[in-house]
């Protein structure tokens, strides 16, 4: 049984936010790098970078906090498609999270995309997670 690196990334960021820990270190894979870039581009995290220790690569993510409140921008995240149960959607049926305030991250034939990008390119794929 393999590790689910997407769930590790999402859970690590969510747990770090709950205990107000600023940075998270997870194993770097192509999928986690792409999801990290999407979260950075959409403004849910402040920074993401790759770090190497010996032969292992890690992804270090820094949480983004609101100014006066000690709350993060990424309030909730939910893993949708799991290794035991894959969930697919065409571009017309991609759900909207909180009326468009959150994002859906999809794995498509053109890479890891947000729901807006997938609708614009008119391609569907596997729904990986919701973030809001």
From Swiss-Prot:
MF term (GO), any: rRNA binding
Q: Which InterPro entries match?
A: Ribosomal_uS8, Ribosomal_uS8_CS, Ribosomal_uS8_sf
**Pfam families tied to this protein:** Ribosomal_S8
The entry's keywords: Chloroplast, Plastid, Ribonucleoprotein, Ribosomal protein, RNA-binding, rRNA-binding
> A Gene Ontology biological process annotation?
translation
Keyword Lipid biosynthesis set for record: no
Q: Which SUPFAM superfamilies match?
A: Ribosomal protein S8
Where is the protein situated, by its record's location annotation? Plastid, Chloroplast
Is this entry keyworded RNA-binding? yes
The GO cellular component terms are: chloroplast; ribonucleoprotein complex; ribosome
Role? One of the primary rRNA binding proteins, it binds directly to 16S rRNA central domain where it helps coordinate assembly of the platform of the 30S subunit.
Q: Which PANTHER family match?
A: 40S RIBOSOMAL PROTEIN S15A
Q: Subunit details for this protein?
A: Part of the 30S ribosomal subunit.
> What family is reported?
Belongs to the universal ribosomal protein uS8 family.
Q: What is this protein called?
A: Small ribosomal subunit protein uS8c
Q: Which organism is it from?
A: Pinus thunbergii
Q: Upper lineage ranks?
A: Eukaryota, Viridiplantae, Streptophyta, Embryophyta, Tracheophyta
